Amino acid sequence: WAIAEILPRRSRLARRAPGGGQGERIVAANVDQVVVVFAAANPEPHRRMLDRFLVIAEANELAARVVINKVELVGGADAARERWIDYARAGYPVHLTSAKRREGLDALRGALSGVVSVLTGPSGVGKSSLLNAIFPGLDLRVGEISESVNKGRHTTVGGYLHPLPGDDGGYVADTPGLREIGMWALAPESLDVCFPELRPYLPHCRFADCRHQVEPDCAVRAAVAAGEVSGARYESYLKLRGELEEQ
């Protein structure tokens, strides 16, 4: 076999190179959706890190969905649902799953079938365990949580594209767990459109270049004050905007 032609990527998921680097790191290419997996506990989830993943997906114009695994550690899906309601209200499909108890797997299997997905998220949240539970033939290696730092150990050390069984087919890329996630090539003034729940309000700000901080007649701040937009997500926007402006 020989490579005859390299076709352009139709999509990509890119982040800043780790370790404070300034380069671009391609996580996956030619995918249809990004599936961001976090644990309900063990390791403790950090919402701002989840927001970073979602902003990167939005900036790369990729559909995203959220999976909260290990819900058995917090009393089940009903107990976990309220903590993550902000993401459902923002328009993201949210899957509450337990690979251990095989809960919530059918809906996630349906979301993965027939498309090319990339699973990403921190180490130790159960990405490989989820894939093994949904598609037993994959037989992926799984790891444990370090008791000393409450963080996952890497068990997936490279990105792998797995064909999915079944009539609908599809592929899933299982990527190594990430302990840091940096945004790449995103202008600070473009951040607000990467928060779907802010988009309806952006045309109604008095100033076209509104930063949604202290400007008068800011429709975004008015929506937050009225409870129409999550205060936690808005605070995350402000934090991430500050980081982008410092880069």
PLM ranges: what are they?
Residues 6-27, 31-33, 62-64, 71, ...:
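Helix-rich effector regions associated with P-loop NTPase G domains
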Residues 57, 112, 130:
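Conserved hydrophobic/aromatic pocket- or pore-lining residues that grip, position, or stack substrates
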Residues 2, 22-33, 42-62:
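Switch/coupling subdomain of P-loop NTPase systems
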Residues 63, 70-125:
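Canonical P-loop GTPase G-domain recognition
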Residues 123, 128-129, 133:
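Walker A/P-loop
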Residues 119, 132-136, 142:
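Conserved ATP-binding TGD loop and adjacent catalytic N/P-domain core of P-type ATPases
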Residues 36-39, 67-69:
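Conserved beta-strand segments of the P-loop GTPase G domain that flank and frequently precede/overlap
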